[in-house]
């Protein structure tokens, strides 16, 4: 699966929330179907995301690139340390959670 293609498709046809604060909030409330975290995200943020995602039974995928690369992949002119997939739309992005 082409992660870049599926992420962009999810952004166009579904609902994707960017940012660590919003991702942690959605992990706490169980409002996400998948969370993606950049490999170089700050440890405190990663720890919070993994902790709350586990409590809410939300899969977390660690993106192999940096937050700069994740932001670029999404077509954003800023870094993205984490994001939450609320609605995948027409994408098959949730398949990466099964790996």
From Swiss-Prot:
Any single GO BP term: translation
PROSITE patterns (alphabetical): RIBOSOMAL_L30E_1, RIBOSOMAL_L30E_2
Gene3D superfamilies per the UniProt record, alphabetical: 3.30.1330.30
InterPro entries: Ribosomal_eL30, Ribosomal_eL30-like, Ribosomal_eL30-like_sf, Ribosomal_eL30_CS, Ribosomal_eL8/eL30/eS12/Gad45
SUPFAM superfamilies registered for this protein in UniProt: L30e-like (SSF55315)
GO cellular component, one term: cytosolic large ribosomal subunit
Molecular function as annotated in GO: RNA binding; structural constituent of ribosome
Pfam family, one: Ribosomal_L7Ae
Keywords noted in UniProt: Ribonucleoprotein, Ribosomal protein
NCBIfam families found in the cross-reference section: PRK01018.1
Binding partners and assembly: Part of the 50S ribosomal subunit.
The family this protein is said to belong to: Belongs to the eukaryotic ribosomal protein eL30 family.
Protein name as catalogued: Large ribosomal subunit protein eL30
Name of the encoding gene: rpl30e
